[in-house]
Amino acid sequence: MARSRAKDYDDKRRFILHRSAQLFAESGYVGTSMNTIADGCRVSKALLYHYYPDKEAILFDILSSHLEKLVAAIQKADEETTNPQTRLKTIISTLLERYRDADAEHQVQIASLKLLPKEKQQPLLAKERVLVDILADALAAARPSVSHKRVLKPLTMTVFGMLNWHYLWFREGGAMTRAEYADFVTRLVLAGAADAAAAVSRSNGKSKPASKGRQKELL
């Protein structure tokens, strides 16, 4: 007879995922064992194995759950307004707000997704691409001059860089609130994007490709 599922099964699973994310962020995925996770969660190894067969399954669930929440929140934010500038700010604000209390999950996403087998990486990378596509579309709508791929991709990833690494310096109660930082990033991007795109356009075609001999030197 199959073992019945406890009423608090989902709550315990979420706790295991969050605590495991903290442990992975602190000690690294490779340096964290199932024993460490069980001790960190204050549960027996037997109970931990009732939820997950190995730490690879835990890592996948941490990332899948984290990215699903981000995608759902950003998709909702993307539909809240048709004003291009407001739409961009709303998306940036939503991302920063979703990162609240999820620093560990976010660090694990950056550092450990690549440690999963390729077949398990694919659905997670697909979720990441959804986020990238939504932000890129919002940037292009807010500043049409950056819509060319040569400019849009670097700009999109630059914005993600400002948001994804904020946990290294941002402190609640510090110089800026999350809302203020979201406004700061939005204004910075809107003010500088057009000039940056124009500079790239002016330089486009001016640089000659390296000779074959020089290419060999560079390689």
Task: Label each residue range with its predicted role.
Residues 87, 100-119, 168-169:
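Amphipathic alpha-helical segments used for helix-helix packing
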Residues 107-111, 148, 171, 200-202:
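Short, hydrophobic secondary-structure boundary micro-motifs
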Residues 26-30, 80-81, 102, 145:
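Short coil/turn segments at alpha/beta junctions that flank glycine-rich nucleotide-binding fingerprints
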Residues 61, 75-101, 155-156:
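Hydrophobic alpha-helical connector segments
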